[in-house]
């Protein structure tokens, strides 16, 4: 279930995301954060108006902790770590210096425990031009896995991924999705197209087909 929220540009979109998150997130909420180019957490999280019970990372590009292409470094550079430390919010990142499969196994246990602890779960998400979301790529294991977390190699510039699965996303209460730029237009049209129903081919149509309320914030006219 998607509500489209039209904005002028990325800056306005992140401010709108902040306003929506203020209404959705409270201290008994697990807030899951994605990487990507659309979100600016310095704006989206703001200074002190959003107070989740815990923060976790939706997906990661595998490597050493805080490697230069990691989502966790992006989040750190955008102030998420400082935000969590300042307000004593527990935070959970993926990379811990273990091998590929062991990293996923450890994070799976963390996510299972977080899902038991927090009934309310809200995700900040993105959508790729190939309709991937999180680290769930077309025809990937994570699109059909019975687990909450998967490690797999996908066709991408950063192939080794650890990600929440579609099954895990199905546990959420709300999503705030940010997608900007004319290159996303065809992809977003597919997400909203009632004739597109293959989530293995186009994982991001999950947001339309699911009963979970999602807010799609975009500068693209659809």
Say what each PLM segment does.
Residues 173-222:
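ATP/nucleoside-binding phosphotransfer catalytic cores, i.e., glycine-rich phosphate-binding loops
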Residues 123-167:
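Class I SAM-dependent methyltransferase SAM-binding "motif I" and its flanking Rossmann-like core
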Residues 41-52, 138-146, 194:
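A glycine- and small-aliphatic-rich helix-loop capping segment at beta-alpha/alpha-beta transitions
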Residues 104, 133-139, 187-191:
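A short secondary-structure junction signal
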Residues 27-48:
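Glycine-rich N-terminal segment of FAD-binding domains in flavoprotein oxidoreductases
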Residues 32-38, 125-129, 180:
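Glycine-rich beta-strand-to-loop/alpha-helix junction loops that act as flexible
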Residues 1, 51-124:
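Ligand-binding beta-strand-loop-alpha-helix segment within the catalytic cores
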Residues 1-31, 118:
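N-terminal glycine-/serine-/threonine-rich phosphate-binding loop
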């Amino acid at each position: 279930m998607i509500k489209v929220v039209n904005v002028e540009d990325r800056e306005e979109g992140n401010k709108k995301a902040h306003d929506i998150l203020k209404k959705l997130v409270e201290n008994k909420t697990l807030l899951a954060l994605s990487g990507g180019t659309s979100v600016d957490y310095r704006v989206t999280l703001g200074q002190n108006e959003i107070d989740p019970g815990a923060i976790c990372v939706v997906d990661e590009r595998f490597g050493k902790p805080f490697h230069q292409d990691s989502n966790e470094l992006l989040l750190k550079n955008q102030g998420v770590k400082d935000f969590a430390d300042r307000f004593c919010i527990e935070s959970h990142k993926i990379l811990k210096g273990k091998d590929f499969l062991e990293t996923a196994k450890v994070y799976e246990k963390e996510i299972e425990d977080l899902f038991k602890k927090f009934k309310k779960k809200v995700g900040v998400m993105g959508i790729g031009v190939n309709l991937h979301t999180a680290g769930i790529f077309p025809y990937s294991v994570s699109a059909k896995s019975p687990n909450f977390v998967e490690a797999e190699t996908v066709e991408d510039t950063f192939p080794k991924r650890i990600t929440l699965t579609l099954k895990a996303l199905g546990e959420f209460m709300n999503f705030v999705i940010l997608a900007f730029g004319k290159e996303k237009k065809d992809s977003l049209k597919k997400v909203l197209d009632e004739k597109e129903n293959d989530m293995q081919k186009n994982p991001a149509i999950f947001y339309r087909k699911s009963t979970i309320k999602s807010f799609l914030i975009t500068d693209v006219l659809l």
